[in-house]
Structure formats: structure tokens, C-alpha cells
Amino acid sequence: MATNTRAKIIGVGAYVPPKAYTNHDLEEMLNTSDEWIQQRTGIVKRHWVEGTTCTTDLALKAAEEALENSGIAKEELDMIIFATLSPDHDFPGNACFLQVKLDIPGIAAFDIRQQCSGFIYGLSMADSFIRSGQYKNILLVGGEIHSKGLNKTPEGRDIAVLFGDGAGAVVITATENPSESDSQFYSHNLHADGRFAKELWLSAPGTAIAPDHRITSAMLAENLHYPYMNGRTVFMHAVKRMSETLTHTLKSEGKTIDDVDLFLFHQANMRINDKVGEILGIPPEKVFNTIQDYGNTTAATIPMGMRDAVKAGKLEPGMLVGMAAFGSGFTWGSSLIRF
């Protein structure tokens, strides 16, 4: 009989910096209110780093927890995939720096930049590598530090209140000839539409906008080094695209909403997730949200939610899990796995 190689998750981990900032902590700083933030986002608090803590510091903690839960040694890994939009340095990628901190030189290591969709894209890539037979054990990390790049003044409050710092990680391994009830990845669905890239982006620094330097004093004066978001456009597209991609993935596997035990959505805005659930007819108790505790940690939201769901007893082996994300690019995608 031919061997059917699939991928599965065997370990999850997450980490956030110790210092939490509640909405009340931001009221004076940003001239806002707890009520205003909660009504528009569902966020109650977020964690921000202090001092020289960098993204791979957070990622290391998440990776160590995922490895401990996986039951395999770090030396058994043969690839690291790191999804981030906030690397420690412009280059090389964070996967290389994390490799050093884990002390596992020589294995494949690379970054992907798909912003809030990064973890879903990473799942699909890891799945493909494992199904090819070239790799057996892959560490997939989503990690971000947003707090060092936010406009923490009343002018920037619409975006500053949204984002938190954190990291999530999963260890993915090969499994042979799994039965329907065994842990495994089923399918993924990925998309992008670059026509909307400037509706949610960071224009500077970059090689496209300055003749001699990637950033200038004029750019700083115009706040081009802070992220820009067209909130209304992002909301409408996120709801539409997340609903579409999840429907497509379920249909491709002959599954329905009723078959899925738990949904893990990217945590950008509670109103987005509520609307997607309403459109698809998902019972609220099947959706596990963490945005109230962490804010939007972009590529880290889904693996962080996965870890928290396990700890809360909401996610157990054998459960069918549907995931969907939407982010800058625009990029979006979904995955269906049996945990």
C-alpha cells in the first residue's frame, strides 16, 4: 500500500511580555476611554515589551514551550518557519536569529511576511514540505513586537489601541497513513489581492520612496514610519474574505460548520469575528477569542489562541479545527486540521 504522509501538530506554545496595559492605562496617553475601545474592538488589555526585548526573545519562550509539549528534542527539528512583520533587524530573517537562540545550527530557517495571515500561510508551507517527504519536524512561529512602532499620541490612537506584542509557536511533524479520526492537516486555502496593499501598510522605511535613503527627516515629520489603516475598508474585506475562504476549505473536504468542533480566527477585531460567525451560522461557543486579553498580535494570534484553548480545555486531541485570517496585502486564507 502506498504511504500517505500527512502533517500534524504535536506541540503548542505562546508567550507575552509581563507588562499588561489596560484600556484605562491608555486613556490619558491617547485621549481615549475604555468604553470607546471595547465598543469598537473588544480589546480590554494588551501586553507591550519593555527595554531592549526583541521579537525573537518572545519567540524563544513560545518555541521552548511548544517543544516541551511536543515530546521531541529541539535537535530533531529540521526546519524553522518564522512569520513576522516586526523582525529584530532588516536582515537576515528572524528564523536565523531564533535558530541561534535555540542552538540548532544547520537546519533550514526562513521568514515569511504575510502579516496577519502569516500563520495560515506558514501552516500551508509546512504541510507541503512534510508531504513532500523532505522534512519531518518543523517549528512554525508567529511573533510580533508592535509597541515599538506605534504612534502613542492622540493622533495615532485608532491604531495604537489595537496592537499587542506576543509570540505563538507550533511543532509540526509527519504522520503516516492517518485514519479519519487521527490528528492531521486536511487542506488550506490562500489568497492575496495587492490592489489593496496601501489600505493597510507601513510606507517607510523603504526603497520605493526616497532617492538616496530609505527614510528621511521629512518622512518622519509626516509620520510615514507609523502604520496606516483604512479601517472601514479593512473591516468589509476581512468579513467577506474570511467567510469565503473558510466556506471553500470546508466544502473542499466535504465538511460543514456543524462538523467543526472549534474555530480559531485571527484576532484583529471582535466585531469582525462576530460578523463572520453570524454570516456562517457558527454558534458563538464554537469560536475561541483572545483579543480581549492580547489585542492584535498579527501573525501570533492564532497559535496564541491555540495554546490558550488547550490550557482552557477547549481544544483537545481529535477535535476538528477551522482557522481563518485576513491581513495586510490584502492577504487571507484558511486551514482545516484535526488537532
Stretches found by the model and what they are:
Residues 9-11, 37, 66, 77-80, ...:
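Buried hydrophobic positions in well-ordered alpha/beta secondary-structure cores of metabolic enzymes
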Residues 1-51, 156-236, 244, 339:
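Condensing-enzyme catalytic core mediating Claisen C-C bond formation in acyl metabolism
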Residues 30-39, 89-103, 140-149, 212-220, ...:
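Acidic-glycine-rich active-site phosphate/pyrophosphate-binding loop
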Residues 10-13, 83, 113, 138-144, ...:
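Short beta-strand segments
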Residues 131-167:
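Flexible, glycine-rich active-site loops centered on histidine and acidic residues
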Residues 75-83, 257-266:
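Short glycine-rich phosphate-binding loop at a beta-alpha junction
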Residues 2, 56, 60-63, 67, ...:
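Claisen-condensing/thiolase-fold acyl-transfer catalytic domains that form or cleave C-C bonds
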Residues 69, 73-105:
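Anion-binding (especially nucleotide phosphate/pyrophosphate-binding) glycine-rich loop
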